[in-house]
Amino acid sequence: MKERGPGGTPNQEFTDPEREQRRQQELLDGTNLLPELLKERMPALYSQEHERDPLVAVKYFDPVGSWTWYATEGSPVDEDGYMDTDKLKVDYLFFGLMVGFEPELGYFSLNELKTAKEGLRGLRALPIERDIHFRAQRLSEVKRRHHIS
């Protein structure tokens, strides 16, 4: 949100520093799976489809299991899973690498990550988190770390 600067003249506008600080703080909360700044920086679905080695933007993980999700792209979608409609966008669809029972490239949604642990109890019920220490890197590097050819 822009506010008028000192003197109130239009050419002295600046960004609300509290809002920016709040947006930066959101990045440090691993339980916030898709903070505003990350959403803005996420490459749109299909934007890297012709890249040989796409950039991985975000990593999600099960804190008590072995499942990990690496998103290379993502876009808001409507209730039917479509991006290009005038309908209300109610979910976020990612494409990337999922490492669980066996590694695979495919689609997963923010809703799936949020509800993956429903019905579980105890430690197994700990929700999926976003790795706040993960830095964007090429998919080939992620595959190498997981010993995936």
What is each of the regions a protein language model found here?
Residues 1-63, 147-149:
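N-terminal domain-onset segments
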Residues 2, 12-17, 83-85, 90, ...:
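Intrinsic disorder/low-complexity signal
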Residues 3-6, 28, 79, 94, ...:
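Intrinsically disordered, low-complexity segments enriched in small/polar residues
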Residues 40-50, 71-88:
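Short linear motifs in intrinsically disordered
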Residues 55, 66, 91-93:
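Extracellular structured ligand-interaction cores
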Residues 57-78:
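Hydrophobic/aromatic-rich, well-ordered segments within soluble, folded domains that form packed cores
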Residues 80-102:
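Catalytic Cys-His active-site segments of thiol-dependent hydrolases/isopeptidases
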Residues 96, 101-149:
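Helix-rich interaction surfaces within compact, conserved domain-sized segments
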